[in-house]
């Protein structure tokens, strides 16, 4: 078995999700993409106890940010796509003017091919499509406001720690109504982590 099989599967799902969202959403900015990925992961986790991409999110000012991905694609004020993504995704610079007259530089993802949805389970495909439909015409600002709604992962984390910048704990997103208990989800995540660690040795 390939030592990196677990990471490769997560990486492939991340790429295909980004290709899909950039195709289906009108404003696939960097911050919007972060929001969409977070929605995909947290919604799937709430139903199954496992995220789709296995990204770790932190609670930043404007919403949840996948820290590892952000650090990988951000170089100063530029957005640089990794080699394994650049054949499938492009990125265009755009500039918008706010109501106050402030000019803001944005990056818009652009798909170069059709997404391969075969890497996702039927449940993952359903959630992927639901998230894209919800935010199809939303702006990054509207998506950011949605992140701040009561009960959302970002809001729970800020309330828990009283500050921005902390890691959003997937387990904290589960409620009594969730199909999976916190204990079950914790055990599944620990098993998945142990599996990856064993094959990385």
Q: What is each PLM-predicted segment?
A:
Residues 1-201:
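Domain-edge interaction signal
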């Amino acid at each position: 078995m390939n030592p990196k099989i677990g990471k490769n599967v997560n990486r492939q799902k991340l790429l295909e999700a980004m290709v899909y969202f950039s195709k289906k959403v009108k404003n696939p900015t960097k911050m919007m993409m972060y929001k969409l990925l977070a929605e995909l992961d947290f919604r799937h986790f709430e139903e199954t106890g496992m995220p789709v991409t296995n990204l770790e999110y932190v609670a930043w000012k404007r919403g949840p940010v996948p820290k590892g991905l952000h650090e990988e694609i951000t170089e100063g004020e530029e957005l640089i796509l990794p080699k394994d993504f650049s054949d499938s995704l492009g990125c265009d610079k755009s500039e918008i003017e706010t109501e106050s007259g402030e000019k803001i530089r944005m990056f818009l993802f652009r798909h170069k091919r059709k997404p391969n949805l075969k890497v996702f389970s039927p449940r993952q495909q359903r959630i992927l499509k639901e998230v894209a439909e919800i935010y199809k015409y939303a702006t990054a600002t509207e998506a950011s406001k949605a992140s701040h709604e009561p009960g959302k992962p970002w809001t729970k984390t800020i309330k828990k720690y009283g500050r921005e910048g902390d890691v959003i704990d997937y387990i904290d997103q589960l409620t009594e109504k969730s199909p999976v208990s916190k204990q079950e989800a914790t055990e599944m995540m620990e098993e998945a982590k142990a599996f990856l660690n064993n094959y990385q040795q």
